[in-house]
Amino acid sequence: MNVFRKKSIDSILAESRNKTLSPTMKTMDLVLFGIGAIIGSGILVLTGKASAEAGPAVVFSFLIAGLACCLAALCYAELASTIPSSGSTYTYLYVSVGEIVAYAIGWVLIGGYVLTAATVANGWSSYFSRLLAGLGIEIPKEYYTLPAAGGYGNIPAIIIVLLITFILSKGTSSSKLVNNLMVAAKVGIVVLFIVVGVFYVEPTNWTNNFAPSGFSGVMLAATTVFFAYLGFDAISTSAEETINPEKALPKAIIITMLVCTAFYILVCLVLTGVVQYNRLGTGDALAFVLEEVGQNKVAGIVSLGAVIGLMAGILSFIYAGIRITYTIARDGLLPEKLTKVNQNKVPSTLTWGLGILTALLAGFLPLGKLADLANVASIIAFALVSYTTIVFYKKFPDIKRGFRVPGMPVLPIISIILFGALLYSVTLTTWIIFVVWVIVGLIVYFAFSYKNSKLK
């Protein structure tokens, strides 16, 4: 039994050329797609909580997490320009390490993307309910309360996930337009917050107790805000729907990371400059800070923008989950029915299946620590991609690359070390959930995937 059999690069490139998906994405579409995935619940929810943990030194938390992700982004850019496949991390590992490792990380990433989308949907529901309450419209609490707490479920979260799934089922042209509009709204409210908030900054809020919890607090916050960077890897899952992917993908990945890191740092500087850090442990910190300085109307606009903007995050993560699942199924490791496309060149069965699963998770399960699985899955995936870049550097030195990681192999090694440091602070509960999910995936692999693999 050869569970470490590998796909050839030539076969993957041939699959990419014989596209059943429709290529419509350009560099700017990819940048907006990436921003839509990254700037979401992270900047709207986590910045306040991380600031409460690390104080004004939270900017270093974002820099540490951002540096690790930027190094991984360079590795993604090289691999995406070399092997433009919707399988992303899964495909890179299939070539470099072998089938069972590729399948396992693909399985984990599917779970991670679905859980992240469900988590963002929960955040959207909270903002939506708060926005309606501000307009004098009260949704009965039982309609956004989980059954375990005496409610009917998070109905707004279910509805928004199904609506976005419907948009995705209409093809990338429709979903691209909707995503671009939502991202414009999201970026607009972040810029509005920075421009308005900067006039209320008190520098003494930065200098007094700059790092209240020391370096450990900065690292703890770095692990927390890592969630805020999830999404840049989703760009590479759109490879087979991208025009000229060898050039567009690396450009989009790098531009997206630079823009998002700059936004995060500016938002944190304004947050901790306007209000003392120990008052920022709220889930709607941006609106809270604006209300504290009497900018209630601007706070309302920010809440409205959050409702619109978080939808882009849900769309991006469901899309990424669909594309990775599609590629795994195309290789025979999941049922072939999942690869059937409709008249819009969309795998409709897969799209609706993953969308309904996300809706059920968002509506009826207390995600809580389950959402941390997305962090672990992504950290391990990013570390493996950094490792794979080194493998490609050694095994395929002459292969055509649209982009090369500078300073090989030093930068990928630094990336792996940084991700190892982030994994060190992951809780035991999260590790148990992760291992259980991997075991379930391996049961599926040995029961179905191995014998149905296109590689014999």
Regions found by a protein language model. Give the residues of each.
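Membrane-interface loop-to-helix entry segments
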Residues: 125, 152-200, 212-215, 253, ...
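C-terminal membrane-solvent junction of multi-pass transporters and transport-like membrane proteins
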Residues: 149-152, 212, 337-347, 382-431, ...
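TM-loop-TM module centered on a large, flexible mid-protein loop between adjacent transmembrane helices
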Residues: 91-92, 98, 129-134, 221, ...
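Membrane-interface "cap" regions at the ends of multi-pass membrane proteins
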Residues: 1-46, 52-56, 70-77, 83-86, ...
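Extracellular loop-to-transmembrane helix junctions
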Residues: 22, 45-146, 256-259, 263-266, ...
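Helix-loop-helix junctions that connect adjacent transmembrane segments
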Residues: 16-21, 58-59, 63, 135-157, ...
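Membrane-helix boundary/coupling elements in multi-pass transport proteins
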Residues: 44, 85, 108-126, 224, ...
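Helix-loop-helix connectors at the membrane interface of multi-pass transporters/channels
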Residues: 94, 121-152, 189, 241-246, ...
